[in-house]
């Protein structure tokens, strides 16, 4: 659906042990391959590969790279996550290298937007992701996780099905009012 590949820092940008940089899109594997010491082309989905981010043959950081192949990913696109050391400098440098090699900086919420537009999650689940990020207590987090699991959709599904049947019947009556075998709507 999308013809570009996006990248962003997925963890808070602060000094810490680990930072994660996420890349999603058709060219995710190719772009990460351009800066990674190992070839991900033939690696299995949901695998982790140890290696180095390199620039001009010199190591930039020691990393673990997680590979998730479409469609079994959050965005339903190929997704690669680089787990690097958590300093702000090295995290930004790796992101910059990805952008220089063809990725585009993701907008805030764009990974979830792609998950929604690619049919991975529905609107209530997309909203719940933000609710989870903003949750400040157990009750709010619990409500958000139930929404992410699709409990609202499951609750509403019988009503949605009934409405879809009603719409179909109305459309048949509009399109074929002269046929006797079509149940008349009043």
Q: For each of these PLM feature ranges, what is it?
A:
Residues 1-142, 146, 150:
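A glycine-rich (often HGG/GG-containing) alpha/beta subdomain
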Residues 2-9, 13, 141-186:
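C-terminal-of-GTPase-core extension/linker across diverse P-loop GTPases
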């Amino acid at each position: 659906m999308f013809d570009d590949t996006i990248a962003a820092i997925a963890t808070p940008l602060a000094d810490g042990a680990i930072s994660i940089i996420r890349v999603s899109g058709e060219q995710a594997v190719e772009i990460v391959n351009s800066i990674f010491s190992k070839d991900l082309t033939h690696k299995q989905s949901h695998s982790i590969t140890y290696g180095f981010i390199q620039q001009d043959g010199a190591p930039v950081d020691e990393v673990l790279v997680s590979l998730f192949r479409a469609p079994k990913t959050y965005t339903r696109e190929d997704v690669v996550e680089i787990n690097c050391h958590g300093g702000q400098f090295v995290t930004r440098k790796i992101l910059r290298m990805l952008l220089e090699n063809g990725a585009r900086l993701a907008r805030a919420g764009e990974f979830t937007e792609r998950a929604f537009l690619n049919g991975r999650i529905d609107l209530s689940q997309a909203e719940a992701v933000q609710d989870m990020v903003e949750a400040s207590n157990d009750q709010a987090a619990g409500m958000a996780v139930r929404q992410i699991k699709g409990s609202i959709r499951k609750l509403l599904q019988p009503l949605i099905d009934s409405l879809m049947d009603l719409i179909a019947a109305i459309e048949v009556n509009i399109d074929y009012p002269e046929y006797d075998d079509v149940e008349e709507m009043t």
